[in-house]
Design a protein with these regions (language model features):
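N-terminal Rossmann-like FAD-binding beta1-loop-alpha1 element of flavoenzymes
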Residues: 16-41
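Extreme N-terminal leader/targeting segments of oxidoreductases
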Residues: 1-16, 34-36
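Long alpha-helical scaffolds
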Residues: 32, 165, 194-196
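Short, hydrophobic/aliphatic alpha-helical segments
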Residues: 36-47, 194-195
Length: 196
């Protein structure tokens, strides 16, 4: 009787489990896969429907393609000022230093940014930035970013679970070690276990 009453869950195990397939989730899954981890990616709707696709402005990166006075230090100062100096100093610094490489990486993965007449990535002005700094794809930068991340991620061996709703997190102390998710397409629960 106990076996009859206990629900049977499909069990899946990964080194890394990422919940959310927006820009941050896809990028985290790609990075984990590049470190040779087995990766599961859970998204609540279809892949490509994350809110990131609605981002229009662009990616702030001090590449100096339009104004050669732009540097990561100026970008950092703009970010701190924009956050009224209560931002996390180290995160703002890392963002300013690493964002040009992130834009180049997206381009290597197939993102098609708008171009200057001489072929460099075009950058435009945006509120709070001292120099034109936003790498963009017209007014659909988020959509292009997600497309490039998805295309690259799919070829990295990341297993994607679409239309899954996470119902519970399982923790070992303060560490999340798994989730219970409902597969809305098939109508049953799955138990995902992960090391990270």
């Amino acid at each position: 009787l106990e076996t009859f009453l206990m629900p049977q869950y499909e069990k899946l195990e990964y080194d890394v489990l990422v919940v959310g397939a927006g820009g941050a989730g896809l990028r985290a899954a790609i990075e984990a896969s590049a470190a040779d981890a087995s990766v599961g990616l859970i998204c609540k709707s279809l892949l490509g429907k994350a809110h990131t696709v609605m981002a229009e402005g662009g990616l702030a990166a001090a590449m100096a393609n339009v104004d050669d006075r732009d540097t990561w230090k100026v970008h950092f100062a703009d970010t701190m000022r924009g956050g009224q100096y209560i931002n996390n100093f180290r995160m703002a610094q890392l963002h300013a230093q690493e964002s040009p490489q992130c834009v180049r990486e997206l381009e290597e993965w197939g993102a098609l940014f708008d171009r200057t007449k001489d072929g460099r990535i075009l950058q435009r002005n945006f509120g709070g930035h001292k120099f034109p700094r936003l790498a963009h794809v017209g007014d659909r930068t988020g959509l292009e970013m997600i497309r490039a991340l998805q295309d690259h991620g799919i070829h990295q061996g990341i297993e994607v679970y679409m239309e899954h709703t996470v119902a519970s997190l399982f923790k070992d102390g303060e560490r999340v070690v798994g989730v219970l998710a409902y597969d809305r397409e098939r109508g049953h629960f799955k138990l995902f276990q992960a090391k990270a």
